Structure formats: C-alpha cells, structure tokens
Amino acid sequence: MKWFIASDIHGSEYYCKKMINSFESEKADKILFLGDILYHGPRNDLPKDYNPKAVIILLNELKDKILCVRGNCDTDVDQMVLEFPILADYCIITDKDKVIYATHGHNYNENNLPPLQKEIFCCTGTLIYLPATYTKITHI
C-alpha cells in the first residue's frame, strides 16, 4: 500500500487542493493526515485562501481514503463536520514488515520521543525517524 503523508493545511483551500492533486498524481492508496486540518490557531496568521468550509467538502469526498490523527489545532467541533475520525492522538499502522507510529508532533516529537521498540518508525507532522538510531529519514 502506498501512503501519502500530509499535515498542517490549517483550513487553506489552496493547500488542500495542492495536497489532493499531489495525492492523485502520486497514485497513493491512502492519505495519512497528521492533523491541523481546519483551524489556523491563535498564534498563526490566516493561511493562503483560508476557507475551512471548502476544505470540509474536499476532504469529506475522500473520507474512505483518509487516516487522521489530531493536531494541536483540531477540536471536537472540527470532528462534528468531518466524516472521518480526527481526534486520536496517534495511530499505529502495520504495512508489510513495517510498523509506523504516527502523531502530529505536539506531544511526541524529535525532542520527546515516544517509548517505542527500535524497529518502529515514528512519523510526526515534520519528521519521520527511527528512534533506535535517531536518524531522520525522508521516506519509508
């Protein structure tokens, strides 16, 4: 199975469409979305083409292809309008001989690694790495 990994579109219709176009051109099977879907948060400026209602429509059309974890800007209110689960803090994916721990990165990240076995890949909104060696990798 081919996974397309994305995160942090923060309600931007522009970046959501770019993500979907890339997902389709890569011919990936599933999107692993690492949070921060609709809201930009109080610390951030509005993203380009901020339109969370359009993002809701675009992503709900792909609901059967999305596996999502909660980002630090995602809330129960967001879950009310999205037709796929978004509120898990992490997920564990088994794909062939690989085990992947996926999270947004606000709880576990490069400086605060989750307690994982050495053969498990850890994927956050900004990094993919193998905790046993602390080596950053760009693909799985």
Label each PLM-derived region with a short phrase.
Residues 5, 32, 102-104, 123:
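Structural motif
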